[in-house]
Amino acid sequence: MYVQELEPVAGSLGLSALVAALPLVIVLVLLGGVRMKAHLAGLTGLLAAVLVAWLAYGMPLGQTLSSGAQGAVFGLFPILWIVVNALWVYRMTVRTRHFDILRRSFGRLSDDPRIQALVIAFCFGALLEALAGFGAPVAISAVMLVALGFEPVRAAVVALVANTAPVAFGAMGTPVVTLAQVTGLPLDSVASVVGRQTPLLALVVPLVLVWLVDGRRGLRETWVPALACGVAFAVAQFAASNYVSAQLADIGAALAGAGALVAVPRARVPAAESVRASVLTGVRSEELDEEDPPREVLRAYAPYALIVVIFSVAQIPPVKDWLARATQTFDWPFLNVAGPDGEPVGGNVFSWPVVSTGGTLVLLAGILTAAVIGVHARVAVREWLATVHELRFAILTVTSVLALAYVMNLSGQAATIGHFVAAAGAGLAFLSPVLGWFGVAVSGSDTSANALFGALQVTAARESGLSPELLAAANSSGGVLGKMISPQNLTIACAAVGLAGREGDLLRKVLPWSLGLLLVMCLIVVGQSTPVLGWMLP
């Protein structure tokens, strides 16, 4: 049995933490400084983690490699199993042009460009985040806004800032699923706390968006529908993440936000010509004026309706218990690890939820979607294989980063860093979202930041007497605010609207909002760690 040691380097916690942090530092420097491709940076960091575990911590090489293999397998199933199937559903709607029908349907909710920004970037973007993630919401929302006549820079900035509130539950809950796994905390517990943090951002972001579109006038004239949209989004995200399913949080929130905009009379008032003239300075696409049969509009919404129904049914206690029976649990081969206290760690056992996992439920929704929107079985299979091919580098990135995280967690590297960081004491609650923000700003992924920093956040929380669930959630909630400034997302936004090479211009425009909202999140977490806002936690 391998027993984790907290101070393997010269008996010093500080030196040990410095060595333990090397894999993380290497990944972040390669991504943010050298601008190396993410999958190569992940593999390099994994190699560093293996060497540190073996040479500095004395973990047997066989167990080190086995822990990395477990992380890679978890990356494939359930994480990438969810992502692949969700993106597959999206690709089928694109192939049949039902995606175009859906975006035209959203675009017709109002002719006011400020409301259109909310509908497309905030609500429709959240719907895309729920299924596709990985930069797709920013690219597609920005292109749609340009097609409406938005100036490219304004469209890109709006799309970037809007892609915040839904990120923690994106790709059918992938970030929080990863966070729960690497920390050993129950998914429901982690998701419920995240669902009491990011909805507070959702209250603010729509107001920020109308300001970005039309300044003080936009805020003065459209604050009522913007606030209604934010409140509906926040309530739905909170309710889904706490009482239904984390995987449904973004879908429910997106539809609720759009529904609120439809329900508020002020959102349907035509914009003054002076507003349209000052905001819509680009060229409008004629494609947006096409008329779609009501039957096809219903079919365009069908994939999302099917996902909501299937996930909701899966949460009914008898059904949930029946699905859970197929879960396979077994001791992971060549792995026998104990914590510093000599007790076996949870990582020795691997759980494989074959049927109840979100990816399998999305696969079922995808099969039904293919039938509803008229995709032949052979074409559906080709699209699924094409999805895997499209994600090949993302697959390598996710598996390498999760392998790295598992090596660090099981060797004791994460525990060492966590004990060292715990010295921050009460200030840890303020710094916790900053760590997640930094991780996403560099990696471009809330999932990666949760995999890298989730375990050390929990260790630090336990050592400092704070709630592990609170700091784990803060890592993800703070991380969503780093996405708008990540080089990956800036590049995607620039490419989508034809601003190649102008990432710096976008960064200067979104950085103040990223930092300002991060400060708000830090204060929320500090408040939740004290009696001031502690009542908000479950």
Model segments located where?
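Juxtamembrane and boundary regions of transmembrane helices in multi-pass small-molecule transporters
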Residues: 168, 172-278, 477-538
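Transmembrane helical segments that form the transport core of multi-pass membrane transport proteins
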Residues: 290-435
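Short helix-coil transition sites and intra-membrane helix breaks within transmembrane domains
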Residues: 77-79, 90-97, 127-137, 165-172, ...
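Alpha-helical transmembrane segments of multi-pass membrane proteins
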Residues: 114-126, 152-165, 188-206, 399-400, ...
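Structural signature of hydrophobic alpha-helical transmembrane segments
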Residues: 8-22, 75-79, 131-137, 188-203, ...
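Structural signal for alpha-helical transmembrane segments and their membrane-water exit/capping regions
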Residues: 15-16, 27-63, 84-96, 264-270, ...
